[in-house]
A protein has these predicted regions:
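Extended beta-strand/beta-hairpin segments
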Residues: 1-46, 54-129
Length: 129
């Protein structure tokens, strides 16, 4: 089970704590932040991108495929119809057959974070005593 704690002491800069890892999230200057770290949607995209490349690396390892460097570029946008979309574009430094590429696209659609985002998730919110 994943667990993260976020601490906010001043403006929009947030301390994100996950086990022994620490990072800062913030809003860009244009939104009143200090741009001291990725914005929340950038962290969401980073989660999806990391899960994608990890899953592809695991799958390729089991198949004996050499992918080389994996690059996953992601872009979030909300259309005028309020429809939210994430565009995920993957590239590999090693040559792959069209069949391998098609299979990797299929596998990317089955990563844990992809499934969570695609299904939606219930969020229970409360105030601690």
């Amino acid at each position: 089970m994943a667990h993260v704690t976020v601490i906010s002491e001043f403006m929009y800069a947030q301390q994100v704590i996950s086990g022994h890892h620490r990072l800062t999230a913030d809003e860009p200057v244009s939104l009143g932040g200090g741009d001291s770290g990725p914005a929340p949607y950038e962290l969401l995209l980073a989660s999806l991108g990391a899960c994608t490349s990890i899953t592809l690396r695991m799958y390729a390892g089991r198949k004996g495929w050499e992918l080389g460097k994996i690059t996953v570029g992601l872009r979030y946008a909300r259309g005028s119809d309020d429809q939210e979309r994430i565009d995920r574009r993957m590239s590999f430094s090693k040559p792959l057959s069209p069949e391998q590429k098609a299979r990797l696209v299929e596998i990317a659609g089955k990563t844990p974070v992809t499934k969570t985002l695609s299904r939606g998730v219930a969020i229970d919110t409360s105030v601690a005593d």
